[in-house]
């Protein structure tokens, strides 16, 4: 049994610091690096890319709606052409920086509101899928486990991996509990680490309503910007190793 660990990185902007990239990168196998639309500036993004290359971490484009003010967490009703152009712009920008650093973008993981919207909105999902195929049809798409997007993207010919979240509560339908609700984000490192192992071994988690909910987890997202994130990430990795679950990139395994 194996699993990939990913995290959202490169999100600092000028003097504003977000996350703990230098501490999280040695833990993960895949880095979802901001492309400047929800967070990140060119210098900071390039530094994160270079550190990822140095550590042998796979690079992915963390594409977003154009929403710096809202950190990409606000829904946007963009036209198909605009969304395609936005996604193409972001992938190509990050891929250019990765090329300079001696690597390349190997997957795409949408961010925030875009991630949540295309999980079920087939129109916007089609625009994102088409943009990825236009740029490089070999890129892997990271999608919410159990969402409509998984099958929609596969039907369109993309490679897809299903993502689960280590520190997020789930509804009984497999969707994430809204961050606005109490209990949406989990903070107990030992509990979360045990939950991740259980998710992988049993193929699901207990929902916020106490119902077993099937979750396929090809990759697990570790948040680097929450309280206790470093402790939690280390605990998860240690628990995986303890249970003989191999940690390796999903690229070429999708």
UniProtKB/Swiss-Prot annotation:
One GO BP: carbohydrate metabolic process
GO MF annotation terms:
5-oxoprolinase (ATP-hydrolyzing) activity; ATP binding
Q: Which reaction does it catalyse?
A: 5-oxo-L-proline + ATP + 2 H2O = L-glutamate + ADP + phosphate + H(+)
Q: List the disulfide bonds.
A: none
State whether keyword Nucleotide-binding applies: yes
Q: What's the domain of life for this entry?
A: Bacteria
Q: Which controlled-vocabulary keywords does the entry list?
A: ATP-binding, Hydrolase, Nucleotide-binding
Q: Name one Pfam family in it.
A: LamB_YcsF
Q: Which InterPro entries match?
A: Glyco_hydro/deAcase_b/a-brl (IPR011330), LamB/YcsF/PxpA-like (IPR005501)
What EC number(s) does this enzyme carry? 3.5.2.9
Keyword Repeat assigned:
no
Subunit structure, as described in the record:
Forms a complex composed of PxpA, PxpB and PxpC.
Q: What does this protein do?
A: Catalyzes the cleavage of 5-oxoproline to form L-glutamate coupled to the hydrolysis of ATP to ADP and inorganic phosphate.
> Known NCBIfam families for this protein?
PRK05406.1-3, PRK05406.1-5
Q: What's the family?
A: Belongs to the LamB/PxpA family.
Question: What is this protein identified as?
Answer: 5-oxoprolinase subunit A
Annotated source species = Acinetobacter baumannii (strain AYE)
